[in-house]
């Protein structure tokens, strides 16, 4: 949940600073995995559009890694059907979010795609809260 909140926060900064216009290529920025001058100053992580969009992109990669890990852990624990169904929904919405994010970049921030990306972030946050709530409810009944 912490990763998701940070990611949504950086998404908000990306939109607010119009940082999505910084680089219209993916996965590289300016032809590099690590563009120069990203972290010249600590304040760059809050003020510099290039650094903000870089962090937003890399937190997406972290999500790509974490979702299968969580998926495997939940499947291994044999949670009830509604929790597993919620996990499938969560996985699908994460995949949609990443797809919309990449399409937003490649379309040079087409407003419709960008708005869908933001709306889907709200859906993703709601699903994550619901999913965590269900996990805790199941864990309490097991205890």
Give the residues covered by each predicted segment.
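Polytopic transmembrane helical bundles with strong interfacial aromatic enrichment
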Residues: 1-143
């Amino acid at each position: 949940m912490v990763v998701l909140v940070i990611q949504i926060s950086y998404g908000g900064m990306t939109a607010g600073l119009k940082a999505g216009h910084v680089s219209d290529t993916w996965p590289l920025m300016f032809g590099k995995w690590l563009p120069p001058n990203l972290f010249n100053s600590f304040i760059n992580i809050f003020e510099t559009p290039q650094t903000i969009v870089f962090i937003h992109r890399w937190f997406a990669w972290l999500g790509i890694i974490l979702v299968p890990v969580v998926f495997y852990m939940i499947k291994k624990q044999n949670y009830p059907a509604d929790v597993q169904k919620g996990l499938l929904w969560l996985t699908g919405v994460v995949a949609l979010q990443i797809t919309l994010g990449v399409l937003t970049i490649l379309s040079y921030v087409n407003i419709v795609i960008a708005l869908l990306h933001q709306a889907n972030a709200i859906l993703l946050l709601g699903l994550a809260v619901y999913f965590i709530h269900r996990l805790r409810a199941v864990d309490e009944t097991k205890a």
